[in-house]
């Protein structure tokens, strides 16, 4: 916009100068023409009309000055335009330099950050290595301490195991004695019919065959039915204990009835064996179990010392 305004001003000045020149020329021509037509009349005024050439010279000088001034102004404008053109170039150069400096700074910052990251990684790896080495040393020391204590531990452990085994055996013996004792199963008195069946020396092996052949039931058959009924009322895991306690009660009663001279004799032993042998077939006679010694912890006891 500045350039356009300057050009318009310059054109206006040129047009004004041209107009003044044309006006001056017309005036001069008119004066000369009048002088030619009126040479005599206006002759005395020639001296008076001499100054106009000076005026014409002044006008020419002014016109030259006016013409020079626009030229100077135009030159100044061109210089100003060149300066304005140079300024954007200078600004562009400055911007490029700033941009390059920013890139250099960013590159330096990235390099610095990368170097810091490498240093941190190196420090972390070094710390981890130190921690691992410390843990390994601690483990080695702990293992050495364990190795020193290992020779003493097996002896103590073996002694503790032996004590625990002895305690377990003692507890098992106590449990077995309580199980096989007479008072362990409180419902042994419910087997009165089985008790009477064995006292009358009824054979449980023979009874199944006699049931099909005898027309009238004998006392042993009646006791058999009642004994089986009593056994079915007892829980299965307590049947053998109840039978064993019943046999012990029978043997004690016989010992009380017999004189003490026969205690420990062969006759008493045989009677006890016969009772036990008959008692072991009571479950099979009733269809409960096949053998008295099956799952019976008390059947392995020695009956040689029953008469003490």
From Swiss-Prot:
Basic and acidic residues biased stretches: 120-129
GO MF terms held by the record: nutrient reservoir activity
Signal sequence annotation: 1-19
A Pfam family it matches: Gliadin
Annotated stretches, region: Disordered: 27-159
GO cellular component, one term: plasma membrane
The entry's keywords: Cell membrane, Glycoprotein, GPI-anchor, Lipoprotein, Membrane, Seed storage protein, Signal, Storage protein
Subcellular location: Cell membrane
Superkingdom classification of source: Eukaryota
Record membrane topology: Lipid-anchor; GPI-anchor
CDD domains xrefs: AAI_SS
Function noted in UniProt: Zeins are major seed storage proteins.
Assembly and oligomerization: Interacts with OP10 (via N-terminus).
Family, per entry: Belongs to the gliadin/glutenin family.
UniProt-recorded name of the protein: 50 kDa gamma-zein
Organism: Zea mays (Maize)
């Amino acid at each position: 916009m500045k350039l356009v305004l300057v050009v318009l001003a310059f054109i206006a000045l040129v047009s004004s100068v041209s107009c003044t020149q044309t006006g001056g020329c017309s005036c001069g021509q008119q004066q000369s023409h009048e002088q030619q037509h009126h040479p005599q009349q206006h002759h005395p005024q020639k001296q008076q009309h001499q100054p106009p050439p000076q005026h014409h010279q002044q006008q020419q000088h002014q016109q030259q000055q006016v013409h020079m001034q626009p030229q100077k102004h135009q030159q100044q404008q061109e210089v100003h335009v060149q300066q304005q053109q140079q300024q954007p170039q200078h600004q562009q150069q400055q911007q490029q330099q700033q941009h390059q400096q920013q890139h250099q700074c960013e590159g330096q910052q990235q390099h610095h950050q990368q170097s810091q990251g490498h240093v941190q990684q190196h420090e972390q790896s070094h710390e981890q290595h130190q921690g691992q080495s410390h843990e390994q040393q601690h483990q080695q020391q702990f293992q050495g301490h364990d190795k020193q204590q290992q020779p003493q531990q097996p002896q103590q452990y073996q002694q503790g195991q032996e004590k625990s085994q002895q305690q377990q055996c003692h507890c098992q013996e106590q449990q077995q004695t309580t199980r096989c004792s007479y008072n362990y199963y409180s419902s042994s008195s419910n087997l009165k019919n089985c008790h009477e069946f064995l006292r009358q020396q009824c054979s449980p092996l023979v009874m199944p065959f006699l049931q099909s052949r005898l027309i009238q039931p004998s006392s042993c058959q009646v006791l058999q039915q009642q004994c089986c009924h009593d056994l079915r009322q007892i829980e299965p895991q307590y049947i053998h204990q109840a039978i064993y306690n019943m046999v012990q009660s029978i043997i004690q009663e016989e010992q009380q009835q017999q004189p003490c001279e026969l205690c420990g004799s062969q006759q008493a032993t045989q009677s006890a064996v016969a009772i036990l042998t008959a008692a072991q077939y009571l479950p099979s006679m009733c269809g409960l179990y096949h053998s008295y010694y099956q799952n019976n912890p008390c059947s392995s006891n020695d009956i040689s010392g029953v008469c003490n």
